[in-house]
Amino acid sequence: MRPAHYQEKWELLKDTEDREAINSLAQRIASSFIDRYFYSDEYNSDYIHLLCEMATHYSDTERNQITSRALFGIVIERLCNDFEELQTETYNRLICQVVDFLRNLPGGKELDNELNDFQLETAEKLYQRIESIRLCPDERLPAKLQPRKVLILSRVTIGADVAITSVICQRVSRTFPHAIITVVGNPKLEQVLSKESGIRIHALQYSRLGGLLERFMVWLDLLKEIRIELKGLSTSEYLILDPDSRLTQLGVLPLVPDTNYRFFNSRGKEDYPSKASITELTNMWLDNVLGHDEFCFPKV
């Protein structure tokens, strides 16, 4: 069905308490977007706009979460789990559209202000930023960068933190033995990274069950925590590594100037081998960024 049909259905449901009806409509809209995208190569922004509207319409979180789950579960996760380059580009475009919707809500004022401070006033500018990062070759760190502190963003899921984050921690600690290395993420990371490693954990929760606005507002919390960690450091004294973290919506949302930030596109790049394991890709990315070859296995 076309978006106009679903818009009519939504107009009839706006004041309903019928959660099953909301869920049914949200799932049909999300599935229609996916079907048209994969089978007709059509990115129809009207479907996404309607899902955003439904996911932020109600005053109670529970009804908003219904559509948020459909948007993430049916659309966003599907794009994330498909390691084709085109789906990565589409994910970036979609997230930029969602951010643009949210920043214009009454509750999105702080989100809008922070993005404006990064000179990212529009969805297109946000999109161009992440696409330039995605498409450019991995950039080696400049020699003048001698970080006293390295912040590594968690991948949020334990399995990915073992396979990717633990490798990054080992490589970085060997390259910068005198730096304070901190992983930002769930406190449960203490169960993954041994105390003997000397890696600090800066606790920050990301709820995968939250509403649409709440999922993106975690970026504001992350910004505040990053600024606390970096207080008093010059631009040559810190580094942030983002291994495709959900905390930044897979790199779409910025944290610091690009000179102090490196993003690992774990979903693959044109110059990455197509059949390499995620651990091999992580080491390959670190070879490029750190400027020397080494290989570390996941470690807990």
What are these model-derived regions, one by one?
Residues M1-V300:
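Catalytic machinery of carbohydrate-active enzymes
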